[in-house]
């Protein structure tokens, strides 16, 4: 599984080690691409005939010199697929509400991309999607009323703290949730 960065890597390793402590023996690996440059990794893995899955954020970004934000996460998915499957829309801001709306309006296509292309776009991003699954527990473990802001402030370090705090039951909850269906898919 290809992921954006160390936060995803830490969390997903913790979850998978609970579900299947020997997942690497079964040929399951998680690789951080340290950004969003998935396409080259996918090409190499395809050439080697290695199955891959991508987990990436539903980013809205403002192109240089423009006032509106575009669906950068959708562009990323289209690039990996090699065709324009998802619409590229403009938004006045990069709010979480806009990301959720964008996802909801295209959920059927995104589910098809999950099933047929192995690309799992977050509804929003790692931290918001995780908060949707475990909000109360995150508040308790991280001693904050805003776990998303806390996790995004110092991503790697704060995710390391969280990974130590979450329980096996939390891991099973994450594993079984739609937002993290990539984890179940990679274990098939």
Segments from the language model and where they lie:
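Acidic, divalent-metal-binding catalytic cores of TOPRIM
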Residues: 1-188
């Amino acid at each position: 599984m290809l992921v954006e960065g160390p936060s995803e890597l830490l969390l997903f390793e913790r979850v998978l080690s609970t579900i299947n402590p020997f997942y690497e023996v079964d040929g399951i690996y998680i690789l951080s691409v340290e950004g969003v440059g998935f396409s080259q990794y996918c090409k190499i893995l395809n050439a080697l005939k290695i199955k891959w899955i991508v987990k990436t954020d539903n980013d809205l970004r403002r192109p240089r010199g423009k006032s509106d934000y575009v669906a950068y996460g959708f562009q990323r998915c289209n690039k990996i697929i090699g065709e324009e499957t998802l619409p590229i829309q403009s938004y006045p801001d990069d709010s979480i509400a806009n990301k959720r709306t964008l996802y909801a309006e295209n959920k059927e296509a995104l589910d098809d991309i999950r099933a047929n292309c192995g690309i799992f776009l977050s509804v929003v991003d790692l931290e918001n999607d995780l908060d949707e699954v475990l909000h109360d527990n995150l508040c308790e473990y991280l001693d904050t009323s805003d776990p998303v802001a806390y996790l995004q402030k110092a991503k790697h370090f704060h995710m390391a703290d969280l990974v130590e705090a979450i329980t096996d039951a939390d891991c099973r909850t994450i594993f079984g949730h739609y937002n993290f269906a990539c984890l179940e898919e990679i274990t098939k």
